[in-house]
Amino acid sequence: MTSRKILVTSALPYANGEIHLGHLLEYIQTDIWVRFQKMMGNECHYVCADDAHGTAIMLKADELDITPEVLIKNMSNKHQIDFQSFSIDFSQYHSTHSQENKDISTNIYNKLNVAGFIKTRVISQAFDPLKQMFLADRFIKGDCPKCGSNEQYGDNCEVCGATYSSIELKNAKSVISGVTPITKDSEHYFFDLPQFEVQLKEWTKAGHLQDAISNKLSEWFKEGLQQWDISRDAPYFGFQIPAVEGKYFYVWLDAPIGYMASFKKLCDEQNIDFNEYFNKDSNTELYHFIGKDIIYFHALFWPAMLIGSNYRTPSAIFAHGFLTINGQKMSKSRGTFIQARTYLNYLNPEYLRYYYAYKLSSKIDDIDLNLIDFKQRINSDLVGKVVNIASRSAGFIVKKFNKTLSSYTIESKFYQEFFDCGDIIAKHYEARNYNQAMRVIIKLANKANQYIDKHKPWQLIKKPNQQTQVHDVTSLAINLFRVLMTYLKPVLPIMAKQVEKFLNIDELHWQDLKYPLIKHQINTFKPLMLRIEDDQIERIIEASK
């Protein structure tokens, strides 16, 4: 079987805030898929970066009395520590504020400009006369021009749902300074998205997107595509538009290009051919994992920019839903706006990896982290079922049989059943239906435990003439545990390493499962995973308020 060449990305976390459990849903989803691809023998690179530009970064740095460069460096360090703690294994983690990103962004812009895809026109915007800066919609608040509700942002009303321009807002105030904005004209640069309507319609209907996303895009096509404002006025933290004074690339122009920039850095470091992955006629695979809220940028602007600058388009975009906790939006007052670091202070990161896997499918439905179900699921599935197989069997092998598995198994058909399930589990992983993969695995874990219950080695060991059967039963149980942990390795990489040490093997490999471990010496079993206690959940909630 020919090895596939795959490049995978996750959306870039913004560099003005810390990672929380909502962010982690996507990175865990992506990491599981990448680890699975590598287990299948595919060449798979996983790149990401901090999204480090924009007005919010500039203002946050100003508030902290540091430079934007210091802010984004500090935040990048925090992000990477959190990701490493959750076993998110990037091939490269970079920043959009990099030379690679500046070079590629400039190159793409110049290609689009020469081809006639960049237009200019004068627009009217809200302007803060005190801070001497134009105001993005989220930096203006006032009364909704439709229903009159106060404290609404400059683009839409959260009360009546109306959309409008910021200059229509009544009694508007600058969120930054508190003064009343004035209206001021400025020349802006636009990417002429409507020119790509035909290519985009073809691309969005060619199997690159989930059906729900493709249907949503059809609605947007009916409404008509609009030119996209890709410029922002100084002061702004970002890359200056070539040969244009006081104008910068909008953060959403260089953010997706950050995927390419991060990969370019990896290519330079590891002697990988960048063009093999991004040339227009590339035979490699490119996948973007994103949240459903940024589909417009990734499924319209991004492929259009790539087409216009003569690069390849993504093989597919995989969107997921939002995270809710206990059925509601994450909330600081309820203690459910949980930072990654807060979680790590109290719980094993692999609990969350498993629970997300148990919930995630290829659909864009929202995922609920119900903390009661979370505790019960981990205690039942991982501790009570999977780990229990090894903990019930290893003691017999170690104490009674010199740590050595038996020379043959009396239930070879049973082992074959576990092995044969590998194909369907692999299909579920490939299709990102992790929830289905987990259900197959736990069903097998139940069967393994039932097998041990049926033979009762703790009773057989008391009978001198049943020692061989005890040896065979517990040896088979250990082999079944090995199969299950191989299937779970993309989800539980830390525990998989501990199991490799316990089993005294180099690595758990999918292709090695055809044959059980025979006459093989294992090591003493050590507890692999502890139960979640109620007070651990309670302390996380308290610490998050």
Curated annotation (Swiss-Prot):
Keyword flag Zinc: yes
Motif ('KMSKS' region) positions are 329-333
Catalysed conversion reaction: tRNA(Met) + L-methionine + ATP = L-methionyl-tRNA(Met) + AMP + diphosphate
Give GO BP annotations, semicolon-separated: methionyl-tRNA aminoacylation
Q: Which residues bind ATP?
A: 332
Q: Which of the seven top EC classes does this enzyme belong to? A: ligase
Q: Which Pfam families match?
A: Anticodon_3, tRNA-synt_1g
User: Motif 'HIGH' region: where?
Assistant: 13-23
* CDD domains in alphabetical order: Anticodon_Ia_Met (cd07957), MetRS_core (cd00814)
Transmembrane stretches, by residue range? Answer: none
Provide the family line.
Belongs to the class-I aminoacyl-tRNA synthetase family. MetG type 1 subfamily.
Q: What is the designated name of this protein?
A: Methionine--tRNA ligase
